């Protein structure tokens, strides 16, 4: 069995950096996670920092683990919608209803799934990899794998497995600090 843990970064502040609570939660989770032979993050400081705290190692930043650049271009507007309605950034992006943003989110979901499939194909039997990404990419990507495309909590995500019987996806729930 080969496994890719696809996790969302830790809790972030208004500037997009990890909060103290987010850092503590990632450090706490480190003790329950398996060893990883590959550690990948987006190029965002919060995903790099999260991956480092989860593993004690520096990740390899990969732009395929990012979130849609079209969403980044209107992130202040989307963040304002999220704050006003008390909803996730992903749900706010959907509510923003900008066709370019929605297309970008969809395209990024396919790119992230391609990265997951590539990494799964490169792992040896019994090996695991970690990819730390963003809710805005993870949820839609897992929607294409038959899971709910709903927003996920910080440090939550999915475990995508590949074995003799094919592939499977299971939800991964973050532990509380």
Please state what every model-predicted region is.
Residues 10-13, 45-46, 135-138, 165, ...:
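Short, solvent-exposed loop/turn segments at secondary-structure junctions
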Residues 33-34, 119-127:
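Glycine-rich phosphate-binding loop signature in dinucleotide/nucleotide-binding domains
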């Amino acid at each position: 069995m080969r496994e890719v843990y696809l996790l969302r970064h830790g809790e972030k502040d208004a500037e997009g950096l990890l909060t103290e609570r987010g850092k503590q939660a990632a450090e706490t989770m480190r003790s329950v996670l398996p060893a990883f032979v590959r550690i990948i993050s987006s190029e965002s400081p919060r995903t790099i920092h999260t991956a480092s705290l989860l593993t004690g190692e520096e990740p390899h930043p990969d732009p395929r683990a990012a979130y849609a650049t079209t969403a980044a271009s209107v992130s202040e507007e989307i963040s304002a919608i999220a704050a006003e309605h008390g909803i996730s950034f992903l749900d706010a992006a959907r509510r923003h209803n900008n066709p370019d943003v929605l297309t970008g989110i969809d395209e990024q979901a396919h790119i992230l799934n391609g990265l997951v499939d590539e990494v799964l194909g490169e792992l040896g039997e019994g090996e695991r990899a970690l990819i730390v990404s963003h809710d805005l990419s993870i949820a839609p990507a897992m929607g294409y794998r038959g899971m709910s495309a709903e927003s996920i909590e910080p440090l939550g995500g999915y475990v995508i497995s590949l074995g003799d019987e094919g592939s499977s996806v299971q939800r991964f729930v973050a532990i509380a600090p």
